[in-house]
Structure formats: structure tokens, C-alpha cells
Swiss-Prot record:
Keywords: Acetylation, Coiled coil, Cytoplasm, Cytoplasmic vesicle, ER-Golgi transport, Golgi apparatus, Membrane, Phosphoprotein, Protein transport, Repeat, Transport, WD repeat. GO terms for molecular function: structural molecule activity. This is Coatomer subunit beta'. Oligomeric complex that consists of at least the alpha, beta, beta', gamma, delta, epsilon and zeta subunits. Probably interacts with PEX11A. Interacts with SCYL1. Interacts with JAGN1. GO terms for biological process: endoplasmic reticulum to Golgi vesicle-mediated transport; intra-Golgi vesicle-mediated transport; intracellular protein transport; retrograde vesicle-mediated transport, Golgi to endoplasmic reticulum. The lineage of its organism: Eukaryota, Metazoa, Chordata, Craniata, Vertebrata. It comes from the Eukaryota. InterPro entries: Beta-prop_COPA/B_2nd, Coatomer_complex_subunit, COPB2, G-protein_beta_WD-40_rep, TPR_COPA_B, WD40/YVTN_repeat-like_dom_sf, WD40_repeat_dom_sf, WD40_rpt. Its main location: cytoplasm.
Amino acid sequence: MPLRLDIKRKLTARSDRVKSVDLHPTEPWMLASLYNGSVCVWNHETQTLVKTFEVCDLPVRAAKFVARKNWVVTGADDMQIRVFNYNTLERVHMFEAHSDYIRCIAVHPTQPFILTSSDDMLIKLWDWDKKWSCSQVFEGHTHYVMQIVINPKDNNQFASASLDRTIKVWQLGSSSPNFTLEGHEKGVNCIDYYSGGDKPYLISGADDRLVKIWDYQNKTCVQTLEGHAQNVSCASFHPELPIIITGSEDGTVRIWHSSTYRLESTLNYGMERVWCVASLRGSNNVALGCDEGSIIVKLGREEPAMSMDANGKIIWAKHSEVQQANLKAMGNAEIKDGERLPLAVKDMGSCEIYPQTIQHNPNGRFVVVCGDGEYIIYTAMALRNKSFGSAQEFAWAHDSSEYAIRESNSVVKIFKNFKEKKSFKPDFGAESIYGGFLLGVRSVNGLAFYDWDNTELIRRIEIQPKHIFWSGSGELVCIATEESFFILKYLSEKVLAAQETHEGVTEDGIEDAFEVLGEIQEIVKTGLWVGDCFIYTSSVNRLNYYVGGEIVTIAHLDRTMYLLGYIPKDNRLYLGDKELNIVSYSLLVSVLEYQTAVMRRDFSMADKVLPTIPKEQRTRVAHFLEKQGFKQQALTVSTDPEHRFELALQLGELKIAYQLAVEAESEQKWKQLAELAISKCQFGLAQECLHHAQDYGGLLLLATASGNANMVNKLAEGAERDGKNNVAFMSYFLQGKVDACLELLIRTGRLPEAAFLARTYLPSQVSRVVKLWRENLSKVNQKAAESLADPTEYENLFPGLKEAFVVEEWVKETHADLWPAKQHPLVTPNEERNVMEEAKGFQPSRSTAQQELDGKPASPTPVIVASHTANKEEKSLLELEVDLDNLELEDIDTTDINLDEDILDD
């Protein structure tokens, strides 16, 4: 089987002819030098052009990043080397390097050197620490030197390719070549070193349309790759994947297996001739330069070949080398969430195939390595070969001794104890297989689950899965697709019953085999089950777990991570990245066990687990209980006062809510509790809550609704003391204390309103208020103040005022007492009364009458106003409390003092 290389185009940048490309080691940038004299920097993540350097008017055939100096170094047909700062776009240095076109630049990985090659047949070494002086010249080629590359395993050695049909290997410090490789029939355009430690290989491409692999120790050609129809312009060993990439003037890019030399894939993006290729260690990105622009493609799987067993032993593949690390060896070292673990790595040996995936079997005794269309099962301890074979795919069963392979797109074989047990052909073919409690087979028609023992169809589901994860008990399964994931419950008892009776069995299997528990619109990258909790990493780099319909975020990851496993005794979850770094995050097994018990409605088990959960984690558990509908248990478990208060309100637990409100001393909480108390008809508690909340509007509503005159009176005093003047005014007014309303308006500077109130309800006070109004207004507008008319001075402007004095006295004497509410039906409404008629024959006292006739208003009735002393402010709540549950409606003031104004007219 060919390598399973996913090839995705990440960037297409249209431009003039591209002569060289380079990738930045840390930024998502691609550097492209163009035939028109420009150099561009593209961001391949955002698909945008981020920087442009106008170098010259001639072709720029070479450009390289020098990341440690923030430089871009260019070489052009004007023979000049230019150095730019890619942050400021400033040109740092420029000098003439050769006497002909500059073909290639190579940057030394550790020293302050660059190597340049040219059509003048020379290679030169430049030292930027010595003001860009030429440290050495390498002579020997007899034609253009097309490319130079430094040996990644020996930085003092480099190789060069020339149109003189030779490849020369040089040593820094020696002006003559170490040796020359000959074999191409035409000029050699490109060269590259193999970066792995197992092969001393070089690759070259030439105008004879051939690609040759050389052993530079034995100085022999070990392989020739044929296939291109035109000159081979670029050739490269990928630094991470076991592939060779070649590009040609025939417009194609060919990908070859670096071990078998088999052609794996041919790419043609329709951008004419391919001139250059660049790749980067630690990345699967490959940059290509063509006549019509540049392209970045992503090759292969990002997911590393890595696996961990239940005891914390991790095995991974670094190229073809298999290594092991043991979490137990860390002992009691302090581990912080998200930090790289300092693991001791042990080499286990080399694998005969290039591992694309590594996976332990369920009990951890064996590990399977898959790649190159083959699988090898090793013992996990010593990496001894136990079994092997050809397969496109491999899957372990839940039974550790059983596994399946996909031999082709139509045949699946099942093995037991390393011996073939059964072979079958799924009805609709087999594009992929999945292990677990049932054997999953994906086809063009969807997903089919089969019984491991007899390969009977259990259920066919119209879904195209990407991953399938089974829980340890086999009751739950997660099916992850490209856009979402589904949680299903496997009903094994119904399956057994259907297999015995054959009831409910259709051509799509057993109808009741699965029950859908939920669908979540999130992309799962990797996942595993702990109990009934599904833990997964998402496409947006979040580490979450799903339980009972709730998604809990454990951590936000700063890069793509892959789940390895969970160690219950450590209470930690372990993940790895593509650089084989291992990190961990805390996840308490007690929390997961509790949530699992709740999901199974096993509350006795949940109660046993609860004491083992730390207090700081209990609120998280309480939120889970609340979402499951168990609010009473959530109230008991939660330690967050805010959460407990909300739950107490929802459950109507007045006592608990009251205690929490007392502790919180929050006005908002008192208001919320007051609403609940009113809904529960607990008016005494509601009054206390409203008082704590200083909600005078609410207290007024409560007092008036209950007809509690004493409460209204006390409320008026308290509201005035605290500056709640509107409530104070309304409270006085409802009690018929119009004189107190008047004094309140005067004290608060509302003199116009006071004047109109006096004219309507207290005619005897009009003159006094007008004088105060005039005095106050004169400070602002003297003319306006003089226009105000005082009744004592302009009696003709206030007809009927004397009669109003009499009516006022009559009202004071006849309406002084409160009437019981039971007399309300006997009281005539204001709109049906004529107070002037009712007051006929009334004789006011001599003193009051004489004052009125003399034009002097009677002294105002004293108004009792709450003092501002500390004693008044600290009144006990007991003074405001009233037993509203046993309320008698005897003391409601039904005296209507809102006299219509028309009764004061003549």
C-alpha cells in the first residue's frame, strides 16, 4: 500500500516567475524571490502578502531567511548580495559578491556565515561578523554552480551541483573539493542531503530528466528515479517524512518513498514549470515555486505516531527509531498543568517500516506499528517481533487477543491470538475499519458495526465517521464526523434478544441496537473515555470533556495536542504534540466517578464518592447536577454562595436564601429574596428584605397593598431621612399629611410645586410659600420674582380664597381621624362631593377666622419629621416589622383628601 499521505493545499500565491522559496522557522511565512526583481513574504495561515522588497530590476534567483538576525538575504543577476531587516524593511548591507549571476545562497546553521554560488563558477564564504568579508573561495567547477547545500549532520561540509555534470563535496577551510560524484549525462541543477541518521545519502536532479540517490561515503549511486518528462529543477529529502520531493519543468511535482523509491503521488497545480522546493524540520509544509506563482502544500498526518498504556508507559516513533518513556520514573516530581514533562527517553531500537501509527492493545502487552502498507506487532516491553503482515489498516478489538486488518477495499480479516480467525467481505466495501466492542467498517454507504465473533451485522448507520471511541464498559460510543460528534448508547441486551428471536432485525441490522444520547456541533481531533465521561481535544485547541449533555472545558491549549491517556491514580490527563513533547492536566477521578454515578442514577454510589471530592471542585459538580435537573442535590453540594443563592431561589428555600443574603449583604440579593417571599405570601420576610435592600418603592407598595398606615408613616420618615423624597412625599400624601408634603417640597427647594400644592390643599400657606418662592427666584431673575402675586397683596387675583380658608378649617376638624376600611362603601367619592356645600354653616375658631380676615395666614400645623440623629438611623428592624400574616384591615385610611379643584372656584 502507498503511504497514506494527506496532501492539502494551504496557499496559492499568484505572481511572476518564482526562482527560490524559503520557509521561516518560527513565523508562518514563505519567502519567494521573483524573476521581476522583487522578493515577497506571504503568511500561509492568513493567505496574505505581508511584506515586499523591491530589490532590483533584474531577476532575484536566491533569497533566504536568517531568522536569528531578522534578515532576508538576496542574490540577484546584478551580482549584488543585499541584506534586509524583515521587520523594518530597511536594507542593512549590500555588496558585490560575484562577477556573474548569483544562483544560490546557503546560510550556515550556527556560524555567522553564508555561502554563495554563481555563474562565475565560484563558491564564496562570507562572514557577517567581519563586515561581510570574503573568508574563502572554492574553485573547481568548470560551469555554472547551480546549488549548494550544507550537510545537516556535519556543518563543516557542503555539496555543490553544477552544469559541468558533477556534484562536488567540500570542507570549510579547504579550497579544493573532498571528492566529486559523476553520473548525470547533463548539467546538474539541484542537490540535497538526507537529514536522517541512518543513511549517508545525497540526492541530485539534472537536465537528463533523472533523479539520482548517492551514498557519499561509498561515493556510489544507489538509485535512479525516472519519471519526469523535462529537466529536473529541484529535488529534496523531506526532513520529517520518508519522502523525496522532485520538481520539473514538465510542471509536475513527484513524491517518492525515500526507502522503497516507489512513486507515491504526482501533483500538477497548473502553474507551468516548477523551479524550486523548500521544506522545514518540524513541519509538514512544503513550499513550491513555479512560473506563475508559489504554492504551499501540507503533507501527511500532523498526528505523531505515539501511544500510552494504562500504566503510563509511552512509546513513540522518531522517524524509524522507536523510543520509550515511563511516567512512573518521574516519581513525586511536581507537575504543573500544561508544562512539558522532563521524561527520561530510552531507545528501543529501529523499526523495519516507517511508522505512521503506533497503538497499544487494550491490556498494554503488545503494540502495533503500521506504515508502508504493512503492520508489525511487537511486545511492548522489549520490542520483540510477535507478528506482521500486509494491511491497509489495523484495529484492535476490546479483547486484547483479537484484532482486524483491512487487506483491501473489499476484504477484512479478523485474527485471534495472532492466527487468522475469519475473513469476510462487507456488503458495500471497506474504506476504513474501527476497533472496539464492535468492529466498525466505513463504506460509501455509511458505517456498519459487526460482531467480532461471527461477523453478523449489528447495525448500519448512514454516517461517515472520522473516529470511533468506545467506553471501557462498552455501553457508550462516540462517533466523530468531520463537523460534529454523536454519543450513542449500545443496548447489548436488546441485541442478544434480537439475535435469539430475530425480531426487529432488518437489512440494516438490529433497529434497537443503539440509542442516540446527543449530538454536539464540535470537531473532535482525539478522544478517550473515562467512565461515562468522554474527554476530547477539539479543532479549536480546547481540552474538553462531555458528560450528561454538558461540555466542561479543562484547558485552552496553545497548540495542537493529542490525547494519550488518563492515569486515575495520578488524577492527570496526558497529551503529546507533534514534536513529541508530553504535557499533562489535572482531572480528578473522583469528579468523573461522581458524574458517572449520577448519569447512571446510582445516587448511593454518588454519595460515597462525594466526600473524596475536594471542596474547590464541588461547585463544578453542583453545576453538573443542576444541568441534570437535580437542583436539590446541587444546593447541598455547591460551595459557591452565588450559586447556592440562585439554587435556593429556584427551589423556594427561603431560610437558606435568607442566610446567604445576610452573609452577602447585597441589595440585589435582598430584592430577589423579597420577590420570592411575596410570591410565597411571607409578607413579614418580604418587608425585612425590602428594608435591607433599601427598596422604598417596594416597601410603599407592600404597605399600601396591606393597608398598614403605621408602616406607611414609618416609611415616610425613613424615606425622607435617606433622601428618597418621592417615596416620602407619596407616603405623607397617602396619610393625608398634606402639611408634611408641603414642608418636604419647601426643604427640597421645589417651591413652585409647593405653591401649587398650597393653592390646592392648604390655602392658608399660599402667602408664605409665594414669599419664599419670590425670595429664591430673585437670586436668579428679579423681574420674574416681582411678577409673582401674593394673595395678601392681590386679593382680587385669588377669588374665593377666603371661602377656601373656611373649607380648609372644616376639613382639618372633620377629617382628622382615620376611618376603618369597612366604612369604605359608605364614603362618597370625591367626584360626587361638593365640599363648599358640606362646609356651609361651619364656624371656624375665633383666632383662625380673625387671622384669615386680617389677611394673615394661620400658622402651619406642625409636621413631625424624622430627625437625622444616629439613633433614628439605627432603628431596629423590629419597629418596622408587622405580622402581615394575621393582618386586620381595620386601620386603613380611607379619608380622601384629593379635593377637586373645581370646588374652590366661585
